[in-house]
Amino acid sequence: VIQNKSTISDETKKRVRKAMKELNYHPNLNARSLVSSYTQVIGLVLPDDSDVFYQNPFFPSVLRGIAQVASENHYAIQIATGKDEKERLNAISQMVYGKRVDGLIFLYAQENDPLVKLVTEEQFPFLILGKSLSPFISLVDNDNIQAGFDATEYFIKKGCSRIAFIGGTKKLYVTQDRLTGYEQALKEHKLSLDSHRTFFADEFLEEKGYKFSKQLFEYDPKTDAVITTDSLLAEGVCNYLNEHQLNVPVLSFDSVNPKLNLAAYVNINSLALGRTSFETIFQIIN
């Protein structure tokens, strides 16, 4: 039926396919690998399939690190993505139930993720590139609270006191942690925390950085430093500052466009994160 052979009647095919759908059945495309029980394939779960993901310098660098170690271990990579959560869940289901991959690496971390819930319940090998609140989930991550603290303190030690923070969506743990570090640094140095100086983008886009910069400097023209958690946001901030001839220092995180005139950047070792991610999931599988 699955192969649509002509020797099977249409009525029989219809009944079997209906049963497959009700049973949530997915064909195992790697049955030929039953002898070894390994597919030699790792699945990568992307946060979305938009151009924004591929434009962000962080992810290609991570992917390069993963691909390097995968190749060294004779593994292939399969990408699971979709335009929304439902499509991504379907892609993951096919990988897990069809045993198309040996394990999964999530290239993002967010609260109450139904995809993570699925693989956890199925006890399928997986790893999160980022943070998890569960002690039972394997992960690879930087100390983003400390990174946010250090970035903020860098400006404070240079005499800045009206420091803005422009980050991604608060659903992402990385945004939450860097914001926490930012707030801790302000508190430790007895500087006031003004919510009008913190902004959160639902997408990492240059235009978001530009838009937030406009709002920021209309609110406080004396803002003396800007921290962005992403290089695309930083690009938008720098474009706004250049257009309005504002000499305000900007700091961003890893994989920064060398054309941007940044005061500093935080190296989050994206290539090493990718390499370590594959090494870790490989150990889990074996």
List each language-model region with its residue ranges.
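Hydrophobic alpha-helical segments within soluble ligand-binding/sensing domains
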Residues: V140-F165, T180, E206-K214, A234, ...
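Secondary-structure junction motif
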Residues: F165-Q184, E235
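Short beta-strand elements in bilobed, periplasmic/extracellular small-molecule ligand-binding domains
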Residues: A70-T81, E183-Y210
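N-terminal helix-turn-helix DNA-binding module of bacterial transcription factors
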Residues: V1-Q40
